[in-house]
Every structure is written in C-alpha cells, then in structure tokens.
Amino acid sequence: MSGFSTEERAAPFSLEYRVFLKNEKGQYISPFHDIPIYADKDVFHMVVEVPRWSNAKMEIATKDPLNPIKQDVKKRKLRYVANLFPYKGYIWNYGAIPQTWEDPGHNDKHTGCCGDNDPIDVCEIGSKVCARGEIIGVKVLGILAMIDEGETDWKVIAINMDDPDAANYNDINDVKRLKPGYLEATVDWFRRYKVPDGKPENEFAFNAEFKDKDFAIDIIKSTHDHWKALVTKKTNGKGISCMNTTVSESPLKCDPDAARAIVDALPPPCESACTVPTDVDKWFHHQKN
C-alpha cells in the first residue's frame, strides 16, 4: 500500500540479510508494532513475508530491534520450505497481520494449546505474486486452526483488496466455490510440509475444517488484545523486541534517530543475491496418511 517502503540490508539468502520497513516520511518502523492492524474499515493490513511460489522461509524477526524480515535459520543453516509434490514452495502469498500476537502464555479455548509467540499468519489467495516486505490491505475470509508441535498456529485466509476478483469473495464458502480444491490443498500443504525435514505431520483443531469470516475476525481481535498487553509490558514478552516508533502508550517507543542507528549498524545493501542451494528445487514425494 502507498506510504510504506522497504530497505534491504546485506545480500538476499545470506545469514545477514534483513528487510526493514519505512513509513511515508522515510523513517524506519517495526512491521510488527508500527503498522496499524487496520488499513480501512473491515480491511486488515498484511505484511508479506514470503511471495507465492518461493521457498525461502522469510519471517518477521520478532526478537530483533525493529523486527525486520529475515530468513529463518536452524543450526546456522538458512531454511527453505521443501517442494512437497505437487506443490512448489508456498502456495499463497504468506505473511502476518501486524499488531497481533499469539500469546504463548494463553491457552486457546478452541485448540487447548498455547500460542506460538508470533503475529498471526495470513495466506493471501489473490492472483498477484506480491513482493517480500510489501504491505497490502486484505479482506479476511476465514481461518484454519493448525496445531504445530503442540502450539496454536492460526492461519487466516484472506484476499488482497486490490485483486480484480476481491468483490466476489466475502466468506470462506466463496473460496470453496470459486477456487475448488484450494482449501483442501492448503490443509494438505500445512499438514505435510515439515515431513521432508523428518518431523511428523501437523494436526488441526475442528477436524481441519475452515471457520468462517466472523470467527476469523474474532480470533484476530483477540490476538490484537494480546499484542496490546505485550507492547505495553503488561505481559511477559518471552524475549520479543517491542521497540517501536508510534505506540504512544508503549514504554519501548523510540525516536527516529534511535531507529536509524539500529539499521546503520548493519551491513549495507548488496546488489547481488547469494547463491541458493540447488537442492531447494528438489521435489519430495510422501505418502499421505
């Protein structure tokens, strides 16, 4: 959306790579805390972390100052999601709704599990392949309750408000009708995507059924309330950085110069990306249970 821009630091697909967000004044901001949850009435902001069809597991760095987007790392190795046949990378634009938080200290009444300590995830199903760090306005359509290694990990289904077909989508049943097979593929993808890494299949609440728009919005609002408690230090942040530039009631609000100092301490932008390992293109075949 207009008003937000990105600035890369270091080379893409490197351990040092970061994507910082800026506001309309060119000042650095946190995509987690400073971008409003709402873009308009009944329209939510979404921070795109992973463009559709790509494999690099990019995410908001919740524990880093200003929460830039970076590639997830495990045992000093950059993480890429596997291509689990018949899928290529992520099958939607994947990201998060800002100013939300799935509280690891809160036992969700629907799933019986605590939150995963991240902003709530979004799968954007429109036709455009978005850019990493792009901020879009989305219409929420429904939600899936995934249980990831014993933690609640909600997956919001939404569509870009700028999509030419957005007016035709108003609830989860419209996705079933207009994109047959997409929701079933979404469940299958989330169920099995960690199997190539040697992990078990993920589980779901509600027998892997998608809940409707109203249910989804209620869940988003509850995660927004948890975020408010987080950013105002009324709850334990579990190591999360709440440094921000706009939340007046937050004790961790900083001025633009302090935010700039965080970015200036990092390596400069790099025109060329690092080489992506060739095995990222490998296709994995796994028998469905």
Swiss-Prot record:
It is found in: Cytoplasm. Mg(2+) 2 binds at residue 121. The modification Phosphoserine is found at residue 250. Its cofactor is Mg(2+). It comes from the Eukaryota. It is an enzyme of class 3 (hydrolase). Keywords: Acetylation, Cytoplasm, Hydrolase, Magnesium, Metal-binding, Phosphoprotein. The keyword Heme does not apply. Mg(2+) 1 binds at residues 116, 121, 153. Belongs to the PPase family. This is Inorganic pyrophosphatase.
